[in-house]
């Protein structure tokens, strides 16, 4: 059994900046209430450019609520969400601002079949995003579609297929390509490999690692699986307790030890 680490200093409130001096994402004092229920309370973290963070917890721990607030599907009761220097925690009615927010943060859900239009091929799905966010002419869009299809490891036949003709792993690759078409700084992966079998899961995780190296996108991984966290992320926070640890080591700890961390406690691993 691994040696129990001793607590380190309090959790830092200011994330490390990216290469350009601005963090890809900063979350400060985030709180979400649903009536009398407090789903998320005083969450703060940050991700540098090309960094990755896992939000770990069991069902009902608030991890998906955090993700939904970051992407803009829920409004926080209190707190600030900054992406690329822009405040996402405030509502906006400007179509231009909404498109900019879409270029800053994208999300890939657990079940791609329910998030893909069953009437659209992979090519058409990606083309729709390119037209919305970039407004490029058709020839440039076709070239970018081909690049993205190749990046996620699909072939020309699969690119022309409808979602029902693709496997679960192939549909997830389409969903990843669609998200990347907006050229986001941050990509949220909400249990995105949980429904895949182990071999396909490993392929998608390896793909995501390669994409991060190539595009410098930052990842937020929502997961209950510490093995997945260990493979893809640099650090992790426990959603209900807000405990921070290096993910490469935390997968070696007993799960009850990880959940028992005090709020704000930081663990240092050798």
Model region roles, listed by residue range:
Residues 140-157, 210:
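Conserved ABC ATPase "signature" region
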């Amino acid at each position: 059994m691994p040696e129990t680490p001793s607590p380190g200093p309090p959790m830092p409130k200011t994330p490390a900046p990216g290469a350009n001096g601005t963090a890809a994402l900063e979350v400060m004092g985030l709180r979400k209430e649903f009536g009398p229920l407090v789903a998320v309370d005083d969450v703060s973290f940050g991700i540098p450019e090309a960094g990755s963070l896992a939000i770990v917890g069991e069902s009902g721990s608030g991890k998906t609520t955090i993700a939904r607030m970051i992407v803009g599907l829920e409004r926080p009761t209190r707190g600030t969400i900054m992406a690329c220097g822009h405040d996402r925690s405030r509502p906006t009615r400007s179509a231009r601002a909404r498109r900019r927010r879409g270029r800053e943060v994208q999300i890939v859900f657990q079940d791609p079949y329910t998030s893909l239009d069953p009437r659209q091929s992979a090519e058409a799905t990606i083309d729709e995003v390119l037209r919305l966010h970039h407004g490029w002419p058709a020839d440039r869009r076709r070239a970018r579609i081909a690049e993205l299809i190749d990046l996620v490891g699909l072939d020309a036949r699969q690119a022309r297929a409808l979602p029902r003709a693709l496997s679960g792993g192939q549909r997830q690759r389409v969903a990843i390509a669609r998200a990347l078409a907006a050229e986001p700084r941050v990509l949220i992966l909400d249990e995105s490999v949980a429904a895949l079998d182990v071999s396909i899961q490993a392929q998608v995780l390896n793909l995501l690692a390669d994409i991060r190296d190539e595009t410098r996108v930052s990842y937020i991984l929502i997961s209950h699986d510490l093995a997945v966290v260990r493979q893809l992320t640099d650090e992790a926070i426990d959603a209900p307790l807000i405990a921070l640890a290096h993910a490469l080591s935390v997968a070696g700890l007993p799960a009850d030890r990880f959940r028992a961390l005090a709020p704000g406690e930081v663990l240092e691993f050798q």
